[in-house]
Amino acid sequence: MAAISINVSTVKPLGDRVFVKVSPAEEKTAGGILLPDNAKEKPQIGEVVQVGPGKRNDDGTYSPVEVKVGDKVLYSKYAGTDIKLGGDDYVLLTEKDILASVA
């Protein structure tokens, strides 16, 4: 079986799903103490890189997703599916898992 090469630009979320590049975890505390990998909090903020067409309504039309590519979003801690591509961390979320858009 041939290996599949996946690029971020080829990921097309379905329905009301949103593909988010996770912001890096904090490397040290406010006091300057370096954190080991096992003590770092899982980030809950990231940048939207791909958006699905939206939730399908009963009449066949779509309700578009409220966020757009480039938006920074805050999402639930244990939400979505974690994906690693090209050394970067991503998460595939449903729109309901997004808590807020961050300016």
UniProtKB/Swiss-Prot annotation:
Family: Belongs to the GroES chaperonin family.
Protein name, UniProt field: Co-chaperonin GroES
GO terms, molecular function: ATP binding; metal ion binding; protein folding chaperone; protein-folding chaperone binding; unfolded protein binding
Induction remark: By heat shock.
CDD domains given in the database record: cpn10 (cd00320)
Function text: Together with the chaperonin GroEL, plays an essential role in assisting protein folding. The GroEL-GroES system forms a nano-cage that allows encapsulation of the non-native substrate proteins and provides a physical environment optimized to promote and accelerate protein folding. GroES binds to the apical surface of the GroEL ring, thereby capping the opening of the GroEL channel.
Compartments where found: Cytoplasm
Annotated source species: Synechocystis sp. (strain ATCC 27184 / PCC 6803 / Kazusa)
Any one GO biological process: chaperone cofactor-dependent protein refolding
Classification via SUPFAM superfamilies: GroES-like
Quaternary structure and partners: Heptamer of 7 subunits arranged in a ring. Interacts with the chaperonin GroEL.
Keyword list, A-Z: Chaperone, Cytoplasm, Stress response
NCBIfam families on file: PRK00364.1-6, PRK00364.2-2, PRK00364.2-4, PRK00364.2-5
The organism's place on the tree of life at top rank: Bacteria
Keyword Ubl conjugation appears in the UniProt entry: no
Main location: cytoplasm
Cellular-component GO terms for this entry: cytoplasm
